[in-house]
UniProtKB/Swiss-Prot annotation:
Organism in which the protein naturally occurs: Mesomexovis subcristatus
Tissue localization of expression: Expressed by the venom gland.
Positions bearing Leucine amide: 36
Function: Amphipathic peptide that shows no antibacterial activity even at 50 uM but shows a low hemolytic activity against human erythrocytes.
GO biological process, one term: killing of cells of another organism
UniProt protein name: Amphipathic peptide CT1
């Protein structure tokens, strides 16, 4: 009877260890695949639309007035 309880406890602990490490490893694998996959690389350029390379004279005047 004692042996069965010990085996049951060890089995439950082992199953918890496997399930938690599976979720942890899945998170790492998903992160790496997002970095290396086409979708992950495509999303790196999401802030390029915010940059405007041309600054007009009105923009410079506004910035100078703002910094006073």
């Amino acid at each position: 009877m004692k042996t069965q309880i010990v085996i049951l406890i060890v089995a439950v602990l082992f199953l918890q260890l496997v399930s938690q490490s599976d979720a942890f490893l899945k998170g790492i694998i998903d992160t790496v695949s997002n970095w290396l996959g086409k979708r992950g690389l495509k999303n790196l350029d999401q802030y390029n639309d915010l940059f405007d390379g041309e600054i007009s004279d009105a923009d410079i005047k506004f910035l100078k007035d703002l910094m006073r």
